[in-house]
UniProtKB/Swiss-Prot annotation:
The gene is CIPK12. Residues 333-348 have a biased composition (Pro residues). Induction: By drought stress and abscisic acid (ABA). Its EC number is 2.7.11.1. Pfam families: NAF, Pkinase. This is CBL-interacting protein kinase 12. Involved in drought stress tolerance. CIPK serine-threonine protein kinases interact with CBL proteins. Binding of a CBL protein to the regulatory NAF domain of CIPK protein lead to the activation of the kinase in a calcium-dependent manner.
Amino acid sequence: MLMATVSPARREPTPQAVRASPMPSAAAALVRRGGGGSGGTVLGKYELGRVLGQGSFAKVYQARHLETDECVAIKVLDKEKAVKGGMVHLVKREINVLRRVRHPNIVQLFEVMASKTKIYFVMEYVRGGELFSRVSKGRLREDTARRYFQQLVSAVDFCHARGVFHRDLKPENLLVDENGDLKVSDFGLAAGPDQFDPDGLLHTFCGTPAYVAPEVLRRRGYDGAKADIWSCGVILFALMAGYLPFHDHNIMVLYRKIYNGEFRCPRWFSKDFTRLITRLLDANPKTRITVPEIIESDWFKKGYKPVKFYIEDDKLYNLSDDVLNLEPADPVPPPLGLAPPVPPPPQGDDPDGSGSESDSSVVSCPATLSTGESQRVRGSLPRPASLNAFDIISFSKGFNLSGLFEERGNEIRFVSGEPMSDIVKKLEEIAKVKSFTVRRKDWRVSIEGTREGVKGPLTIGAEIFELTPSLVVVEVKRKAGDNEEYEDFCNMELKPGMQHLVHQMLPAPNGTPVSEKVERSSSLQAPLTLKLIGTEGSMS
């Protein structure tokens, strides 16, 4: 694993410029170095390209997914070296940490693969380079520095709410993508919720000297959140000044300055900024500013827009980029990306107009969800996976679909005989109770919370499948967020609100049991997918 550790031999940056630490970290190597060549393929899934960086235990390659052509970064770790170097527990910890922190301003871990000799971290490829390379050329404009700092605080706050503390925040570990958005990387030294001592503090002495907090130097235990906030303050000072607040070639003198909080603000710092940076670099962790106080500070609030996102099918989507605002309508319009309903075939009648057909390139929305207006068609859009009849039957014990309202872990499924439009409207009504707003894109209808939280969004996915012309299956899943919060939502809001829509068994006209009718159903219509997205507090 590529890591940066505290070492007395490390040369510190001078006040004239911010310099990179001599030992590249894992994430810093993602974009800094070039060179190398093709490395073949990885387990038949990725084609390796040039080497982006390397360290004692790993190399980082640019790579291409063979099926999707997506560009990724793959960190390749040598198993033998990791074992001999005692790094196995750190590798496992990094994997666990990265799976807990899915955020637009954090480099994503897509998957982890392994062979007999190698471990492969497939990660988001960030094209813009390190933030360090930008600040090393001189101080940034105030609005640019503020935007980076806002994104940094958003990511760090998200990590802290999930019990993750980075402990090595520095410009080398902050990447900037092609859109100018900041990405926090390299969680090799991060601490998880299982690493606290009985006193509730962290005791590992780690980090990079110029960015380490005074309480870490005291070696008496420290609050990981407070230590990260200090590092954020050092980074912000460097962005605005063009040099570090604490600097000296003598490591012990440097530590003394940090310990005592000895720094000076240049004359071009505004009063609001000086007030903020002074509180960020407060040597006393007990009086140091907290994240909520940072967000409420005058300097920080200018132009600040909280990040809102959701996770679907293990992929992260930023609502500000991917979701369109739509006013609620009655009847509910079809999701964008679907064709207008196809008329039923002449040889049969469709009782409720929901039995539309589709071909391989056009997906049709049931008529009960249509306003009659044409929608744009995207032939390249992948068709959602449909459940078959046997999947639906297996939802219920004893193959009985009567009054089905079944829970399986984080999933709830029930059968309804009501029109899909009524189900959608009821979901919208329930969402309003939680102050959610409805948004729609492609096959997704997103319901987004308006209250900002500290532990990320509660994400609930609801899919409606057409089972027969008169029956639908509604499947609700927790995609992300705190499980207890999800259960409260289901028990207090979802179940009571949807109970009257649950199907009651009625005798079939020809005496055939409903379960047998379902078995003979050839296929299910493409589902309408709804996302309930919140930004509730205290979620993990």
